[in-house]
Design a protein with these regions (language model features):
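Membrane-proximal N-terminal segments immediately preceding the first transmembrane helix
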Residues: 25-39
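Short, non-transmembrane cytosolic segments of multipass membrane proteins
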Residues: 1-22
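Periplasmic/extracellular electron-transfer cofactor-ligation site
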Residues: 474-508
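Alpha-helical transmembrane signal-anchor/signal-peptide segments
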Residues: 272-274, 375-396, 400, 411-446
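Membrane-embedded alpha-helical bundles of multi-pass integral membrane proteins
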Residues: 38-47, 52-70, 82-100, 113-387
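Electrostatic cytochrome c docking/interface patches
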Residues: 398-408, 426, 440-480
Length: 525
């Protein structure tokens, strides 16, 4: 060690000398100083925290994802089973999975806030155009990770929602069918679909995101923060004020995520109930079953806007799907990539701000409409639709008969059409809610079967569910769909309130209590 270094280390403790040793060989102090003592135009502001919270959320996803990976088995016969193990048996697995699940949703919200802040502040203008384009690429990568992660539990909800999403890939002109087969891994959905989605979710997309993120941050360091004009406050350093604001925002994001996970459990405890921690956090549906349709299939809430938007083109067939799923979203992304150029026009920045707010507001409105369609029966007064329901059923839905029953009065016909539309919305909502309740029941039964002393057989949880008399019996009988045996036979306790209506509609014996002494006596009477 040189005399200068000896003098510098004189009087320092072991940690100080170790720090000097590392600094001599790495120069880390200069790097830390450059990172922390960057000038912030106009001083620290809360509006600058969104980029940092996004990086924090992504790092949380990486850490929790690696721990989940250690216990996850990506195959059609072991995926659901390994997620069941994580959720219900691994110590703290429910919390780990809950943080990963809800932090992914938080990232989508943070993306929207960060995009709004960048556009409002004009941080896409020269010389930051390339960094803005990189940000848009990062946004698409995050959404891709959210989409591919949906299938990995290999439950009914993720399986059927993924089928809808991948079918959209098939409508791309020329390359659509080949692209769909490439993503799915063959002509049918199965093991190769799952392994490809897992490779995308845990390997290719995160690695690509890290690469683009490094370049994004490097360009951000090169150009510095862009402050809204005019600047009314003096500049300050990144440390300590902006670092403190960023840290508070990160803690707030984690607090919200933990709150979403834990609040239901806290409510149960306050009510004096027993908390089953395996049912806290991210849900786990019944094992994916290609032979069983799933009427409650929906994308996650942040993709509901696209699901609802496609309904605008419902009557247009394949052309409508192509316009709604490919053309319109593609044009929106083109406009966003052109924002740095548009911003140079006289009113370009105002157009960019208005366009971005319009997209966010439109997505919010479409999401609200989708939720309203699914849950409107909870607040629609069915009694107010009684006359419309009676008329519709008597006329068999025939508009000519309905018009005749109303005396061909235009005002009455118009009013009745509105009521019939509400009636249809009510019935569709009821069907969705019934399917959701059935899905919850099936999921609870699957978890109950998997937790029995016999455990999950080598053939997998789906085989366990398929051989369960309690859940398969009603399906075979046709109780849920009103078909098969249930199309003729009733299955209702004769003493119940609804017995009279069901027995009157039945054309064959009531099979409630089949094989019991009471049933045989009733048959012989």
């Amino acid at each position: 060690m040189s005399d200068a270094n000896n003098r510098r280390g004189a009087g320092k403790g072991l940690l100080g000398r170790c720090a000097d040793f590392l600094d001599d060989r790495t120069g880390y102090r200069a790097l830390v100083h450059e990172a922390l003592f960057e000038r912030v135009p106009g001083g620290a502001r809360w509006r600058y925290v969104w980029g940092s919270t996004l990086v924090f959320a992504f790092m949380t996803q990486v850490i929790t994802g690696l721990f989940l990976w250690a216990s996850y088995a990506p195959s059609a016969q072991t995926a659901w089973e390994s997620v069941y193990y994580i959720q219900h048996e691994m110590t703290g697995g429910w919390l780990l999975r809950g943080i990963h699940h809800f932090m992914a949703q938080a990232m989508v919200v943070l993306l929207a806030l960060h995009l709004l802040q960048v556009v409002i502040d004009g941080a896409y203008k020269a010389p930051r155009e390339v960094n803005f384009w990189l940000g848009l690429v990062l946004m698409m990568l995050v959404l891709g990770m959210a989409l591919t992660g949906y299938l990995l539990p290999w439950d009914q909800k993720g399986y059927w929602a993924t089928i809808v999403a991948t079918n959209l890939a098939g409508i791309v002109p020329f390359a659509g069918p080949s692209l769909q087969q490439l993503v799915v891994g063959g002509p049918d959905y199965g093991h190769h679909t799952l392994t490809r989605f897992f490779a995308l979710h845990a390997g290719f997309l995160p690695a690509t995101l890290v690469l683009f993120l490094v370049v994004h941050l490097a360009l951000f360091r090169k150009h510095g923060l862009h402050a809204r004009q005019p600047i009314t406050r003096p500049d300050a350093m990144f440390w300590p004020d902006q670092v403190l604001k960023d840290a508070v925002a990160m803690l707030a994001v984690m607090a919200v995520v933990l709150g979403v996970i834990l609040v239901p459990a806290v409510r149960t405890m306050l009510a004096g109930g027993q908390v089953d921690w395996g049912h806290v956090g991210a849900e786990l549906g019944a094992p994916a079953d290609p032979s069983e349709s799933y009427a409650a299939a929906r994308p996650e809430w942040y993709f509901l806007f696209l699901f609802q938007f496609l309904k605008v083109f419902e009557g247009w067939g394949a052309t409508g799907e192509f316009l709604g799923a490919i053309v319109v979203p593609g044009l929106i992304m083109v406009v966003m990539f052109l924002m740095p150029i548009i911003g140079n026009w006289r009113l370009g920045h105002r157009f960019n701000v208005a366009f971005t707010f319009g997209i966010v507001a439109g997505a919010g409105l479409l999401t609200a409409l989708a939720l309203n369609e699914d849950y409107c029966s909870l607040w629609i007064d069915k009694e107010s639709l009684a006359d419309a329901e009676k008329l519709h059923d008597e006329a068999g839905g025939d508009e000519a008969k309905i018009a005749a029953a109303l005396g061909h009065d235009p005002a009455k016909i118009s009013a009745m059409r509105k009521k019939l539309a509400r009636l249809e919305a009510y019935r569709n909502s009821q069907a969705f809610l019934a399917a959701s309740r059935q899905a919850e029941s099936d999921a609870a039964r699957a978890v109950e079967l998997a937790g029995r002393p016999e455990r999950i057989p080598p053939t997998g949880a789906l085989d366990l569910v398929r051989h369960d008399p309690l859940s398969r019996g009603p399906r075979l009988f046709g109780l849920r769909e009103g078909k098969d045996c249930a199309s003729c036979h009733a299955h209702v306790d004769p003493r119940s309130a609804e017995a009279a209506a069901q027995l009157a509609a039945a054309s064959a014996p009531n099979l409630h209590g089949f094989g019991t002494v009471g049933w045989v006596r009733g048959l012989l009477d």
